[in-house]
């Protein structure tokens, strides 16, 4: 037994420190920070902090007039952990640590493990008791533990708590009030989750929360920790999940924060070529340090367990993975293997995800990772990073670039619509139209769309329809659902007055309808990460800027999706149909109710027996200009397979009966048999001479070639559709082997003419 382990057995209070230094204290917040306690009959607060280089530390606050040295701390482990119990200190008292550096300087630091903090511009920590909140979300928690997070619906509304809607011109709602305002809207719109931009304490409003100083404190801008618990609780009671942004990649240089916590590098990497993001003006965590691992993993679990958060979106993962991220030659140095990968960060992310999802497999760990790093959403045991979702930044960049393009020139950029399918099933993707796309001069989503006022809305409706049908979970930033024209500004609420105008209300209604359709049709979410849930029909009609594909659910139900990215009416557009029968149009982005023209509705469309795109039948539809259409595919009729054993018995019995009957007939009445033969002959003659029946059949078939001839220009893309026979490779030859009916159809057409 090691001396340390022997000591722990004698004094279990040393266990949290031991685990902390091993990088395995996943609940370090229970030990470090400020905790209300009663000792020797006196109530007060015990303070603990990690500061390995400090010469001395004292606790200062209102209770001692902020006098350094009046309440000195002592080392608990004789090394780096400091502790002090102060009687009489109570909840909401403000405090800081006064650290004497090895150089003799005094610096004042906020508590890294504080549960509550002062509101900016003040930055002191506050004593707070997070226990005792009465949760009402048991039903939600139970349901989530049974849910299949990967193969379930996820449609996320990303939002900033302080600018979605304001109480007054400059006064935001507190967390609990915000929930009361938000819940009716989210339920009406049909989103499954809200995702909050960071609500961990931060000093600078303009950082939107991405420069964190309090990894265990919800920002006091919007209330207390229990107000935030109430927010989550109310959302869960309403059936809405809550995801929050979490920022382990970097932290700011504010003097009261983690930076040079005891006068030297503690939380940041001490190597200047690894410890700073100069472009962002922030510091990079030392991911290889055990105490830092305990700190960060404890923070992640703290939000998931103490606040019942349903998932974390991990910010800026790419900046963690690469040593040369945003660094020029000479500003970084390779790892021990000579590569540019940050091996310590990779190991940390694997450990983080293993720990979180090991405890809570139903929670979401979402990576904002913008490169092609492989296996982000594969288990660490298989060499992956262990996340269960990743933002699809490639899809987002390609599609926004495509949608910005004038429709006249989209033909040359058609690959941007289809390229995502080369990698769509390599990771568990979320399709993000996030806050990052509507700031810094990029323009709002609707202002990215080309054309005049009406055209912008038509483009956006088409895009939203395509996005909702594309494999992957969905995310949309607030305001884009009703066509916010201005860029997002964290200081102002959304332009809700736009809903006084028809086009914005109609767009909002369209998004609401899309969201409901998504939730009600498992084909759009049940098999998001496999080719089994998707099939191309028309991938390459670049000339007309049209794509068509199928989405499928686990029970074989299918939705046919057709997108026309050009403001041109397409009449007689032919495309292959997977199943014979009637195709019902169930959503049309050009519907009048959504602000469209409402000029074209296909309603019910019957298949005709003309092989196309690898299918034995096809349909001909009319595509409204700039539109997305959804069709319900008829269900395949399948005959019940016969039981082989029963079939064999039936065959035997039938054969025996036929033999017996034959013997009886031969013995009793041979003339009857002779009379049967002429009847059969006359029947065949009648069939052969019955010209009216064949005449009627060609007449019906004759109408089809006429319709197709009229639509010949539109059929051209269908021919190109045969080009990528990687998808229907097996079906295409089968269709080619059935020419027997085609000559008849042509003959019939000539006869009619």
Where are these regions (language model features)?
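Substrate-binding/active-site clefts of carbohydrate-active enzymes
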Residues: 118, 138-153, 160-341, 605
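Conserved alpha/beta catalytic core and glycan-binding cleft of carbohydrate-active enzymes
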Residues: 308-310, 325-491, 498, 519-575, ...
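Short glycine-biased active-site loop of nucleotidyltransferases that positions the nucleotide triphosphate
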Residues: 74, 205-209, 253-260, 377-378, ...
């Amino acid at each position: 037994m090691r001396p340390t382990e022997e000591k722990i057995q004698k004094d279990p209070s040393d266990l949290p420190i031991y685990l902390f230094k091993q990088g395995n204290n996943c609940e370090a917040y229970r030990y470090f920070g400020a905790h209300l306690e009663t000792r020797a009959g006196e109530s007060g607060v015990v303070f603990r902090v990690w500061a390995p280089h400090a010469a001395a530390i004292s606790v200062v606050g209102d209770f001692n007039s902020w006098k350094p040295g009046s309440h000195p701390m002592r080392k608990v482990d004789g090394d780096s952990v400091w502790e002090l119990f102060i009687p009489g200190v109570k909840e909401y008292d403000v405090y800081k640590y006064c650290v004497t550096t090895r150089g003799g300087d005094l610096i004042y630091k906020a508590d890294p493990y504080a549960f509550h903090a002062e509101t900016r511009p003040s930055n002191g920590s506050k004593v707070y008791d997070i226990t005792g909140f009465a949760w009402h979300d048991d039903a939600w928690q139970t349901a989530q533990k049974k849910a299949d997070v990967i193969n379930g619906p996820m449609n996320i509304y990303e939002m900033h708590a302080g600018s979605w809607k304001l109480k007054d011109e400059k006064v935001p709602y507190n967390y609990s009030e915000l929930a009361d305002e938000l819940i009716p809207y989210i339920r009406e719109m049909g989103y499954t989750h809200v995702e909050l931009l960071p609500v961990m304490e931060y000093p600078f409003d303009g950082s939107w929360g991405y420069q964190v100083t309090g990894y265990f404190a919800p920002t006091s801008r919007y209330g207390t920790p229990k107000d935030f618990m109430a927010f989550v609780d109310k959302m869960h009671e309403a059936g809405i999940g809550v995801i929050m942004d979490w920022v382990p990649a970097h932290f700011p240089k504010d003097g009261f924060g983690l930076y040079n916590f005891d006068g030297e590098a503690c939380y940041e990497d001490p190597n200047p070529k690894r410890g700073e993001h100069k472009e962002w003006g922030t510091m990079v965590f030392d991911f290889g340090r055990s105490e830092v691992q305990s700190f960060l993993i404890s923070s992640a679990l703290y939000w998931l367990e103490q606040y019942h958060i349903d998932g974390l979106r991990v910010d800026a993962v790419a900046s963690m993975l690469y040593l040369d991220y945003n660094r020029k030659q000479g500003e970084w140095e390779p790892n021990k293997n000579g590569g540019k990968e940050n091996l310590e960060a990779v190991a940390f992310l694997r450990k983080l995800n293993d720990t979180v999802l090991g405890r809570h497999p139903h929670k979401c760990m979402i990576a904002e990772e913008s490169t092609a790093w492989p296996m982000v959403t594969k288990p660490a045991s298989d060499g992956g990073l262990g996340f269960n979702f990743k933002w699809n930044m490639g899809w987002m960049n390609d599609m926004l670039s495509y949608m910005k393009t004038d429709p006249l020139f989209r033909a040359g950029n058609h690959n941007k619509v289809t390229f995502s399918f080369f990698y769509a099933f390599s990771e568990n993707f979320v399709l993000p139209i996030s806050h990052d796309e509507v700031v810094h001069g990029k323009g709002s989503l609707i202002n990215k769309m080309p054309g005049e006022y009406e055209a912008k809305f038509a483009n956006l409706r088409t895009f939203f329809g395509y996005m909702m049908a594309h494999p992957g979970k969905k995310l949309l930033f607030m305001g884009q659902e009703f066509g916010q024209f201005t860029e997002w500004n964290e200081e102002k609420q959304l332009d809700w007055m736009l809903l006084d105008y028809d086009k914005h209300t109609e767009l909002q209604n369209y998004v609401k309808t899309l969201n409901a359709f998504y939730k009600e049709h498992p084909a759009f979410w049940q098999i998001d990460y496999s080719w089994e849930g998707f099939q191309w029909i028309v991938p390459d009609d670049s000339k007309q800027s049209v794509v068509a594909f199928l989405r499928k659910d686990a029970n074989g139900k299918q939705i046919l999706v057709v997108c026309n990215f050009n403001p041109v009416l397409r009449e007689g557009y032919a495309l292959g149909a997977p199943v014979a029968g009637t195709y019902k149009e169930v959503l049309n982005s050009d519907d009048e109710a959504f602000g469209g023209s409402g000029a074209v509705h296909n309603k019910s469309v019957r298949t005709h027996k003309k092989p196309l795109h690898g299918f034995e039948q096809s349909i001909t539809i009319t595509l409204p200009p700039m539109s997305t259409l959804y069709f319900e595919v008829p269900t395949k009729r399948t005959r019940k397979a016969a039981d082989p054993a029963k079939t064999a018995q039936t065959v035997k019995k039938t054969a025996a009966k036929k033999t017996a009957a034959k013997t009886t007939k031969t013995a009793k009445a041979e003339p009857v048999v002779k009379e049967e033969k002429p009847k059969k002959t006359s029947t065949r003659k009648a069939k052969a001479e019955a010209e009216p029946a064949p005449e009627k059949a060609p007449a019906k078939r004759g109408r089809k070639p006429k319709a197709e001839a009229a639509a010949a220009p539109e059929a051209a893309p269908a021919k190109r559709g045969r080009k990528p026979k990687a998808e229907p490779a097996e079906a295409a030859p089968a269709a080619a082997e059935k020419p027997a009916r085609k000559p008849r159809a042509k003959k019939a057409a000539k006869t009619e003419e």
